[in-house]
Regions:
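A conserved amphipathic terminal alpha-helix motif
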Residues: 81, 85-88, 139-170
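Short, solvent-exposed secondary-structure boundary motifs
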Residues: 28-37, 71-77, 101-106
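Glycine-rich portal/gate segments that line the openings of hydrophobic small-molecule binding cavities
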Residues: 40-97
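Hydrophobic ligand-binding cavity/cleft-lining segments
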Residues: 1-65
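Short amphipathic alpha-helical segments
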Residues: 12, 17, 76, 149-153
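A generic beta-sheet turn/junction motif
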Residues: 9-11, 88-90, 118-120
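Beta-strand/loop substructures that line and gate deep hydrophobic ligand-binding cavities in soluble
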Residues: 53-55, 80, 85, 94-148
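Hydrophobic pocket/interface hotspot
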Residues: 16-20, 125, 161
């Protein structure tokens, strides 16, 4: 399933891009999003010469799941790693999301880009999610549920970002 999500932020593109690789933003602001724990920064490598940051974030789901999903996964084992390489110069990134416990359950990858959108900026995510279900016709339903949850959380990220910026300015 292909998906596209666009977010609007009240900050210039450089500030937004820098926040997305700032450990305090990841821990404090991302932890305010519904149904997931604050991500744990497993690794972060800055390549000054290339102008990139590669980071691995471990997430855990802590919300309610639709019954169609709980038939196949245990909510307490629903954890995943988001491996992202951010190009700070072009304000673009490539990401891959890999389940920790259900390694063959789904594959998700994509890109995002940040561009100016007065009075702030916008981030556009383009991705692809494939659920490998042993039951015919269920994979598509699970894909829709996962993308719907992702969209819901990402719609709330600009408010978490604004809160984080306000906390930094105190």
């Amino acid at each position: 399933m292909r998906f596209q999500i666009e977010q609007t932020f009240a900050a210039d593109p450089a500030t937004l891009c820098a926040a997305l690789v700032d450990p305090s933003y990841l821990a404090e602001a991302m932890g305010r999003l519904p149904d997931i724990t604050a991500p744990i920064l497993q690794s972060q490598v800055h390549d000054a010469k290339a102008g990139t940051v590669r980071q691995e974030l471990l997430y855990a789901f802590n919300g309610k799941l639709p019954s169609v999903v709980t038939r196949f996964v245990s909510p307490d084992r629903l954890t995943w790693v988001e491996d992202t390489t951010v190009d700070l110069t072009t304000r673009t990134a490539e990401f891959r999301i890999t389940p920790v416990h259900y390694r063959t359950f789904f594959t998700c990858r994509g890109t995002w880009s940040i561009h100016e959108r007065p009075p702030g900026s916008a981030r556009r995510l383009d991705g692809s999610l494939t659920v490998n279900s042993p039951v015919p016709f269920v994979g598509g339903q699970v894909e829709k549920a996962i993308v719907s949850g992702l969209r819901e959380r990402l719609e709330k990220e600009p408010a978490a970002f604004a809160w984080w910026i306000a906390q930094k300015q105190k």
